[in-house]
Amino acid sequence: MNALRTVPVMLDIARRIEKLSPNAHLINFSNPSGIIAEALLNHTDVKVIGLCNCFINMHASIKENLGTADFDYEYVGLNHLSWITSVTVNGENILESLGKPVSMKNIPNLDYDDELLASVPAIPSPYLGYFYLKEAQLKKCLEAEKTRGEICVEIEESLLKQYEDPALEIKPKELMLRGGALYSTAAVSIADAIENDKNEYHVAGVKNNGSLPFMEDNDVIEAKCLVNNKGAFPVKLKNEINPYIKGLMQSVKAYERLTVKAAMTGSRADALAALMVHPLIGDFDKAKLVLDDMLKANAEYIHRGFNE
């Protein structure tokens, strides 16, 4: 539902950028970041780079583990559905020696079984817990006293109250609970690489453009990119991708494409199909129940076609 509300707004902003600043680069934080980038890169001429803080937190964890930033990596996925598939030091892949994946404060933490990690030999981003251990993750969410959304509302109300004080000079502790760690570092680093033509490597949301042969060229993926003053360009991977990763990416990408179409046209059929193809739902009765409730609750904020 976030996408159905946000895609039209971001498209409107993009149209203004096309008119007022056609050479600008738009670094997008708006969630759902991958779907927003999918919409803007395929339906506008704006130079969009999608951004998330998952990778930079994963990179920081590996750096802390190794005691050095002198390592290379391969990275594949979509926004909130991504993996580090190799970590090399002096040409040697040390992925298996790195231990358990990094966790994030805004996601219920579950301990991965060694056999699970061995079955898909890659470091999963924290959001993969929802796919790897769907029932256990759902159980944790249902047992929690409050939903993540309710917690975020409380955090933001507290932050906004503190920001009313012009004398505030310290970073509120609530910021560490919101789940946006290192976002500023990621954004400034990419902006710096573009503005100063640095030819640096960063992970970003961009069009596939042939970098992953199992995805469509126009699919927006999250990839290791070479970034310079012309934009961000995905780097082709050297290693073969696990079939599980390929299959999951393709099914979630189908969901993203259908969601963009639904958001732009107000098509209930496309919205329903999007939910049915998503691996976390995949059931007509569940999809219909959720969609009916959410379309009703958000009627004034979404495409009017949904209400016709």
Give the label of every model feature segment:
Residues 63-308:
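Long, compositionally biased stretches enriched for glycine and/or charged residues
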Residues 12, 57, 250-254:
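A non-catalytic, amphipathic alpha-helix used as a structural packing/dimerization or gating element
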Residues 1-43:
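Rossmann-fold NAD(P)-binding glycine/threonine-rich loop
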Residues 18, 32-35, 53, 232-233, ...:
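Intrinsic structural disorder
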Residues 25, 29-92:
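Rossmann-fold dinucleotide-binding core
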Residues 1-4, 49, 177, 246:
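Charge-dense, low-complexity intrinsically disordered segments
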Residues 2-9, 54, 182, 251:
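Soluble or luminal CAZymes and related metallo-dependent hydrolases
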